Amino acid sequence: MEEMGYWMGDLLEELGCEKNQEVCQELLKKCGGRCAERNALPGMGGLKEELSGVDSMEEMARIISRHTGAECVPEKDGFLLTYNREKGCDCSIVKAGYVHSPVFCSCTQGFHQKVWSTILERPVTVELVETFLRGGSCCSQKIIFTIS
């Protein structure tokens, strides 16, 4: 499997160069969305059901924290989701040492976009605030959407 690590590193290094930055980010976001479909969303039906009909950002944050274990801070236009403080990246590909490039965090962005747009049944925008691969001590994203 060491070869896989080198291969992934080479691929991300090439995709991460200036001329391919947008293409790489979009590709990684799509991969993250597919990962969410396979690995996260099947177990999140209870969260989706409990959030259904909730229109208070504060109540949404409490429910999300209870279900995910993440810090969830309500904001005017969404919430700030922070998890794994000082514990390291959740991604099994990163944990296995296959990737070290911060460009890989676009995968996380796509993952959360798929999760929260599906759970909340509305379009969301995900902004990466802090990540381990970018030198942070946690993984934090701002999930932006409008409450109908």
Regions found by a protein language model. Name each.
Residues 1-103, 124-126, 136, 146-148:
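N-terminal accessory segment detector
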Residues 102-121:
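Active-site helix/loop of acyl-thioester processing domains in fatty-acid/polyketide metabolism
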Residues 130-142:
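Beta-rich nucleic-acid/ligand-interaction surfaces
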